[in-house]
Structure formats: C-alpha cells, structure tokens
Amino acid sequence: MFGFEIQPVRSRNWEIEEEEDQEVVSVEIPKPSISFVNDNYKLEFNNNNDTPFNIIVSTNGSPSIFVKGCFESNQFDEIADISYSDIKPLKTTNTNTVLNNKCTVYRHKIEKSMIFITVQYDLPSERCFGFTELVLNTFKNVSQVLVLDKILNTHYLSQNYTHPIPPFTRAIFNSLFKNDYSLTPLESSNIIENLSASFLTICQVKYIPACSILNLYESHLNIESVQSFTPIVKSIYPQLFNNSSLKQEDITSQFKLMINALNKRNDKGMYM
C-alpha cells in the first residue's frame, strides 16, 4: 500500500514563543552636542530673551553649497559646531569645506538675528528629532525656521510619477507659516522623514512658523539646482542680499568650485 512519509514539523506557535522569550536589547541613540567657539557666544545665547532668531538649516550637498557660496566668505561669524561622537570630521582644503563632514553654526555679521546651520553629514532619521530639539533649545527665542533640503532626504511618498527636470523646487510648511512668497507647494504629502519632518513637527508644537524648501537629488549636481534656492531665500529674507559685497560672478565661481569637488567625490567614491 502506497502512502506518504510523515515528516515532523515545527509549530509556528513554538517559534513565536521562542521569539518572545528572546531578550530585547535596546540601542541607545547617539545624542548631539553643541560646542561654541568661545564662552561669550554661549552666555549670549543662553541668556537671550529679547532677540528673535531666524534659523536657516541647510542639509548636505546642494543646500549647503548654496549657503556657503552666497554668504560664508565675508558675511558669517562661525559661532559653534554640532557634533556626534561617532561622526568624525574630515580634513579638506579651504575651497572644499562642503566635504568636511561637519555641522557648523554661523551668525550673519550684519543681520545678527540670522542663524545658519550647515549640516554636512547625513543624519539617520532616528537622530533628527534629537538634533532639532538641541537647536531649538539652544536658540530659545526663534521667530521662524527655513530648512533647505532635498526631496530624496525626506523619503517623500508621491502620487506624481512624472520626472521633473532640474532646477526644480517645491515647498512644504506647517500651518503657522504664511506663504506670502508665491512658493509652489509640494503635493499633499502622506509622509516625510528626517530633518524636514522633525523641524516642521517640533516647530508646530512650539508655535514656530517653519518651511522646508526641497529640490531634486542629483548624482551629478549642476549649478542650476544650487541657484534655484536664490530667488526663494531672497524673497523671504531680502535683507541678506542687500549688504552683500560679493558680485554674482564671484558667487557663481564659489558654486562651481564646490560643485566640482562634490561631483568628483561622488564619481570616484573618495574624499579630496
């Protein structure tokens, strides 16, 4: 008589019980720390109750290239660094500071209420809320936050499957931000992540107007994408451009130097 050999099997219930019995090991998320250039800055910001700050946060790549190319050379005072114990800065030349794997905090020399934070390392999503809380707790009296970011960084889920051609920028903002600048909104989002999400969310809770300007991520960056931030930032903070002694050709030259350095690193997979 023919039959099938019965093979012993493992119960799925037993596997579930085994998984439940395993000890869950929690991993502590590294916390950021801020180091001021000198104690005077630390005392000034810790005791400030009068000056409302406008903060511009730029993420790695084209956003930080825009900020550094437009303002860093002669309009910024470096006031602090935001660091993590497991993220090491890299040595770079003066023209390639956009590759230094650091987060530097600047204040505008003339418009002293303007704070710039260039985040030149990639932050995992689980670190973004801690980073945002550190920033907003350091500069307690914040009037508005503007994040310059890339769409890819937000892990934005879209129903629009067309492929826009750069330069391409869209805005996403919390309910407290007044769009008086004709910014083109991104289609209604169902989820965003990382620094744009953390700043928009925490600023909403703290009643701070916040907006994120997003452009495309490009594996080979072009100057048009970097320059696409210019009219937007100029419309929101025109005072930043009124006192600039830099000519447009000088700014463009700075953009090109940093773009070439970034593209060369991406092409060769190495830092300069």
Swiss-Prot record:
Forms a heterodimer with psmg2. The gene is psmG1. One of its GO terms (biological process) is proteasome core complex assembly. Belongs to the PSMG1 family. GO terms for cellular component: endoplasmic reticulum. This is Proteasome assembly chaperone 1. One of its GO terms (molecular function) is proteasome binding. Pfam families: PAC1.
